[in-house]
Amino acid sequence: MKKKSFFLLGVLCTVGFFSCTKNMRHVKDENVDLTEVQSSIFETKSPVSTFFDPTGLISASQHGVLDTIQKGFSFTEGPAVDKNGNVFFTDQPNDKIYKWTAATGQITTFLTGTGRSNGMAFDKDGYLIACADMHGELWKIAPDGSHTVLVNNYNGKLLNGPNDVWINPTNGGIYITDPIFPRGYWDASDPRKQNWEPTHSEQAATGKGGHVYYLAPGSNTLVRVTTMAAWNADIWPNGITGTPDGKKLYVNNWTYDGTGQIKAFDINSNGTLSNMQILVNNLNFCDGMSLDERGNIYVSGGPGLNAYDKNGNKILTIPGGGGTNNVFAGQNNKLLFMTSPDRVTSVKMHVKGVEKF
């Protein structure tokens, strides 16, 4: 009986291996056209180390594995969810925005020629607000793919490079982070350019460091809202999100030396910020963030994703997924959709994301 069992097991494993190999054949080609390709073709279960989830945020049906929706990208970012739970995300080096449809699991190309969009979010009218890094602009993209430029400067100077965006659901005001990640494709001859000094301490001394900006509803002028004395302009503000009541803003900063933080601010009635507090300390490679219905903060960065409660306690770790950004999506708003350099992944959750509309 043992020999027969082992023989049968070997046959099944062999069949399974070639089946998986067949399903994954397209993603080995870096030049594959992902347009109109069913994500179910690529969807696999990726073994990862055990999730840290002491409070049961992840659905029991996930069985401790990370779902890979699709591979073969260059650098995915900016996942934004629409009213139907669909996710739009960028492949920044390839200057494309893709759409994942919640009802079918299909991934299609939404837009080519995106201004190298990075962080994105939908407004209440269904327009996609995108941080277009190519020329330091903030775009408003219509459902048909056409766009208008909302802003392209601060006080007449180029932005460093809009990175991520959050829209206050109570009034439509827009917050963006503007860290200093000098890009080789920026036009150094532009007379509006800021002085990108060699060191961040010099940038801080001249007031040209990373900041957070606010665009009020109906305005075309950015307001710098990180003007408090406690703000250190010698940092890279990166991920940004806020509470559904529009009263609290969270901003993290990207570092590689363990000095990263998640900061919390009170949002004033005029959109300015006050009462800056440090929620979490000693972080690395912080990137995009989202919130769930309990107020927990999900932070992408480095090799995975971590979540923290309102008091800054770590309550979740998902290794291997969500290295750049994350958003709650799906038809029931209980799918954690994560972007990483070469792939998009997901985890079914027990909790819902905050309602954005």
Feature-to-residue mapping (PLM):
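Positively charged n-region of N-terminal signal peptides that target proteins for export
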Residues: 1-4
